[in-house]
Curated annotation (Swiss-Prot):
Its cofactor is siroheme; [4Fe-4S] cluster. This is Sulfite reductase [NADPH] hemoprotein beta-component. Binds 1 siroheme per subunit. Binds 1 [4Fe-4S] cluster per subunit. Gene3D superfamilies: Sulfite Reductase Hemoprotein, domain 1. Pfam families: NIR_SIR, NIR_SIR_ferr. It comes from Shouchella clausii (strain KSM-K16) (Alkalihalobacillus clausii). GO terms for biological process: cysteine biosynthetic process; hydrogen sulfide biosynthetic process; sulfate assimilation. InterPro entries: CysI, NiRdtase/SiRdtase_haem-b_fer, Nit/Sulf_reduc_fer-like_dom_sf, NO2/SO3_Rdtase_4Fe4S_dom, NO2/SO3_Rdtase_4Fe4S_prot, NO2/SO3_Rdtase_4Fe4S_sf, NO2/SO3_Rdtase_FeS/sirohaem_BS. It catalyses: hydrogen sulfide + 3 NADP(+) + 3 H2O = sulfite + 3 NADPH + 4 H(+). Pathway: Sulfur metabolism; hydrogen sulfide biosynthesis; hydrogen sulfide from sulfite (NADPH route): step 1/1. Its EC number is 1.8.1.2. GO terms for cellular component: sulfite reductase complex (NADPH). Belongs to the nitrite and sulfite reductase 4Fe-4S domain family.
Amino acid sequence: MADQKFAPTQDGPPSDVERIKEESNYLRGTLAESLNEPLSAGIPDDDNRLMKFHGSYLQDDRDLREERRRQKLEPAYQFMVRVRLPGGVATPKQWLAMDDLAHRYGNGTLRLTTRQTFQMHGILKWNMKKNIQGINAALMDTIAACGDVNRNVMSTPNPYQSEVHGEVYDWAKKLSEALLPKTRAYHEIWLDEEKVAGTPQQDEVEPMYGPLYLPRKFKIGVAVPPANDVDIFSQDIGFIAILEEGKLTGFNVACGGGMGMTHGDTKTYPQLGRIIGFCEPQQIMDVAEKLITIQRDYGNRSVRKYARFKYTIDRRGLDWLKNELHARLGWELGEARPFQFDHNGDRYGWTKGVKGRWHLTLFIQNGRIQDTDDYQLMTGLREIAKIHTGEFRLTGNQNVIISNITAAKKKAIQAIVETYRLTDGQHVSALRRNSMACVAFPTCGLAMAESERYLPSLIDKLEFILDEAGIREEDIVIRMAGCPNGCSRAALAEIGFIGKAPGKYNLYLGGGFAGERLSKMYKENIGEAEILETLEPILFAYAKEREEGEHFGDFVIRKGYVKAVESGTDFHQ
């Protein structure tokens, strides 16, 4: 493959972010002072870069940006806080704590993310410390939920295979704990831990990460086939559980996935993780740590858009990666084992698991937990949390599973579901049940177009077409992203939209239904009228001409609307 297709390994001197990390004294910077500075609701850019490692981003309300500029006021600064919640598992007490904190310090809503955790928006600087202390008091934290480190570790919340799921979740939790930064900066700044006198050697402070941490974010997921609801091929490292006779024997190891790109730069692209071998369960920690150190040592620290692990691998090759990994491990991965994914969506409604426990998967449109005039979703879930004795399991599709419900509690929980009309999605189209959107406007500073606030109304219009075509109950994965950074993993959708400008999107078709294939751009920079005009004949053709069991993404490739994308390096071809 031609060299010019690949991002360079390094591109000159280290970026400014590398300087900020190096000078930060292990993520302290001047954050403590900036948070106490009373003249601005914001913080300096250097500290904002460090704030990500603590689980937060400085944002502003973009709906108010122009008006405040006219009034010569600073932007309406506020913070987003993201919780570290390995595998998306929260207790009822933790759910109630997040609900309370969202009303006390946030905008009164919670956002379930595509990485199985909570986000809170609208927190003012003066409330940040109290808010993070409240999260920690509920036995959660926000460490490494953002930043150039390993982020929230995902895990399949599969109610059908609860015993194996429990084992896999334990590994996800162990990975999350083991790969945390070791600096005490978080505890000093937010939890008032006293700083220990003396300066330890850098390898004592961060034995794995070092003082510069990683070149960019790093994401790990663990999946249990046949469910790929964590989109395992989108992860920097994906561990695919291999079951033999119902027992966990180990994990296939996939490397180098990632969804982000930059419009107009063909050296950036979404990429799928590639399987490099198999490890036994007790080897998973060693494999993850050694892969992270490879990215630490070889990732691009000059240009951040070229810094993800996928580019490190694509530049040097899979054989190089395997050789480097085996050298660091001192042993070799085994041959990959066979497995099969059949979907990357959630399975809604009631299911019965082991030990007589029940699980209820509810549809949460775009992950937004809030009360509106006609749908008291937040209140309903709060009432469930008050009586529930199991867990809340957040899914990678922004939904929630009320899990491990005892037979004695099932009737009471179903009564709350009926009282508040909480939905398992059966009364909405299959397209909507398989939809996902990132936050975008008004809080995300990177958004180029609407996403969460727009996709539901676009689906309203697409549902008219689906009804006419007779395919309302046909599962089709549709996702929207407000920018090309890929938080909603739109490049894996059968129908994907990636924002380019207000009201304008690139339309992508042909992603794999089980998250195993990237999509391909079909039309560029189009608005709603052209979106509907474009999709209508394709959806009608699918209704009439599809083969039995054929998914929409496979159909558009077979009929020649787009070519199959075998690798991210061909995404722009």
